[in-house]
Amino acid sequence: MKLQLIVVLLIALVIVSLVDGEMLEKRCKNRLKKCTSNSECCDKKDRGGRKLRCLTXCDERHCLTYKQCLFYPGLQKVKRLCFTYCRCTI
């Protein structure tokens, strides 16, 4: 009886850890969170229909040393904001 209970508890722990692992993998990053690729950012759109992308941004005319999930305003606006002031690369 005790052995069966232990086996059932072990199986339950394995199932919970598998489900929790899948949940962690499916989590995405919201706006302003650090990222390394577009796939890490949540598949959300703002009011203007812009999607979150993993971009290098500027802070007071200097490039940040990391990328963030930001709403992508289009190449022209990103160039104007980043390339003109601090020559960031997308």
Swiss-Prot record:
Chief location of this protein within or outside the cell: secreted
Location of this chain's protein in the cell: Secreted; Nematocyst
Signal peptide per UniProt: 1-21
Gene Ontology MF term list: potassium channel regulator activity; toxin activity
Keyword set, alphabetical order: Cleavage on pair of basic residues, Disulfide bond, Ion channel impairing toxin, Nematocyst, Neurotoxin, Potassium channel impairing toxin, Secreted, Signal, Toxin, Voltage-gated potassium channel impairing toxin
Record flagged with keyword Signal: yes
GO CC terms, sorted: extracellular region; nematocyst
UniProt keyword Zinc, yes or no: no
PTM field: Contains 4 disulfide bonds.
Propeptide residues per the UniProt entry: 22-27, 77-90
General function of this protein: Neurotoxin. Blocks voltage-gated potassium channel (Kv). In vivo, induces a rapid increase in swimming speed on zebrafish larvae, as well as death which occurs between 2 and 18 hours later.
Family: Belongs to the sea anemone type 5 potassium channel toxin family.
Protein's name in the database: U-metritoxin-Msn2a
Native organism: Metridium senile
